[in-house]
Amino acid sequence: PESLRQASRDFFVGEHWDGKFPASVTDAMAQIEPPTPGRILFETSIPKVSPWSAENPVLYTLHFELIDPAGNVIQISNQRIGFRSVVIKGRELLVNGAPVIFYGVNRHDFNRHTGRALTREDMRQDLLELKRWNFNAVRTSHYPNDVAFLDLCDELGFYVVGEANIESHAFYDSICNDPRYLGAFVERVGRMVERDMHHPAVVLWSLGNESGKGLNHEAAAAWARNRPLIMCEYSHAMGNSNGTLAEYWDAIHSLPGLQGGFIWEFWDHGPDQKLADGTVRSAYGGDYGETKHDGNFCCDGMVFPDRTAKPAMHE
């Protein structure tokens, strides 16, 4: 019918495209009747792609154009993607067919000047700092991170453990078994997976942090015994700490199935506080006169709030 418009080869532009569509793509070029919402689904094989990895983060760009019946381009969208495989074989996690070691760190969103409000450049500087210290993996403790952060992990080359915003320290023995919370658990994990599953950097999912020891976790432990062991948190960097890293890594480098972990954590969460004499210090619990606080428990990173590395980082 005249009201239908078929997608044309002329409207599909790709930097590496030779102008020939596979049959599966041609068959999927659906006719969409304006203004009814429509969807085009197709799958195809792309030859000679370079696999994405933290060491070689090759990305490709998908270019989409939405065209009205008159042939006018009304919307353009670009999406960077990477190609990689992640499988568990025996007791090893394989990326592109090879076992990997996670030199990881736990990272919270934090800036000593702006608190939890970060710019894209703040995120980039965090990742560049981690690159300088030879980290290759980040756990998004304890919530899904901004998509901009995942985009940067795709670009710069980091393996990411995406963690759902499920945290129930004080009640985890009850909430994880309470059916009233089932919908919330499933929804939070599902929304994270649906949003982030196309980022090549995301290779693992975490269902939450310290959120239960119920029967569900007994079942999960039984399932995990024949899987790789990757520590989501270890070597807590508070005070005079991180002194046994050599022993950890001797074991990691010598035992199959032990594939690294994520140090707690990247940096101290001490915001700048200006004192009466004009000097500035990194503050923590109690420094603002509050009576209920957790003391210096927010200062358990390998770098100070001003990004100066502690001896723990050198260790």
Enumerate the language-model features and the residues they cover:
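Active-site neighborhood of glycoside hydrolase catalytic domains
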Residues: 155, 176-226
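Aromatic- and acidic-residue-enriched carbohydrate-binding clefts of CAZyme catalytic domains
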Residues: 21-25, 103-108, 116, 161-185, ...
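Secreted/periplasmic carbohydrate-active enzymes, especially glycoside hydrolases
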Residues: 1-160, 188, 198, 203-204, ...
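Short beta-alpha connecting loops at secondary-structure transitions
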Residues: 169-179, 187, 207, 232-234, ...
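Aromatic- and acidic-residue-enriched segments that line the glycan-binding/catalytic groove
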Residues: 150-161, 173-186, 273-285
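Substrate-binding clefts and catalytic carboxylate motifs of secreted carbohydrate-active enzymes
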Residues: 201-205, 215, 225-315
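Acidic-and-aromatic substrate-binding clefts and catalytic sites of carbohydrate-active enzymes
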Residues: 138-147, 211-215, 237-241
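Active-site beta-loop-alpha junctions enriched in small/polar residues
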Residues: 107, 143, 165-167, 208-210, ...
